């Protein structure tokens, strides 16, 4: 795999164009022609208008969809910030490959392919999992940077390549997921710095920490930030010092979606932080970021607000793996079914509605 340099990454970011407002207007006009109250489908109408602005066309094909589940281990787990150890990352990755996990069952119902990806699982590569690994896990960020700046760039580059490859294979909709013990800790650390928020505000219980465990997690993040002194105006510095290979790879996936013109669905808090990194690197990349749900992690809503994105679902989800993103896909299908096949005012012999305000 050819390594990406920072200069090459910056060149790609410069190629990301603003949304196509002509295509957005065409999608809006089509919605307005259908025999229903104007804006009656609310966020579902906005969804396809935003997709038109991204893809450059008011005609869509989301029949092929995939969820990419990026798996990676985090050295900060050594600080006791999780109920489980790194062996669980590998175990879940193996079960993703065997199509036995929660997201696999949900994806089957949503007619969505599942692509488990190894961005940096501790130990040897996992059979049946796409090998995009940067290293066998990150370092403990309480003792120094989690990864080098070059590794952060490379992880982003591999995420970009992943989305672009899926687009080339004909996928019209890409959902994001992740698996990595300790990644709510890394996500909270990155978000606290980028959003200039207190660590305690940005930190939750993850997979179910006790009060003592939560206090240890908050203290660990504070020590990591103090140790590394990341520059909040330099996303690559923050990602490299406090992030994980999964977050960096997901960041790249959103950037890849902006380059390829493919909607990329956020899952919960972790992929939301990755999307925030992508948009901080390139504001125009926001056109490829589509929210699915609002996680119960305390900082999830703050991240969504920073991105200016509204979730389609609020269902108390906090499982990970991309389950929330996949859960939103049927709403895309229903929106498109109405958009494509609902009769128009003209076809129904009905006088069109006109805006009254």
PLM regions and their residue ranges:
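N-terminal loops that bind phosphate or other acidic moieties
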Residues: 2-357
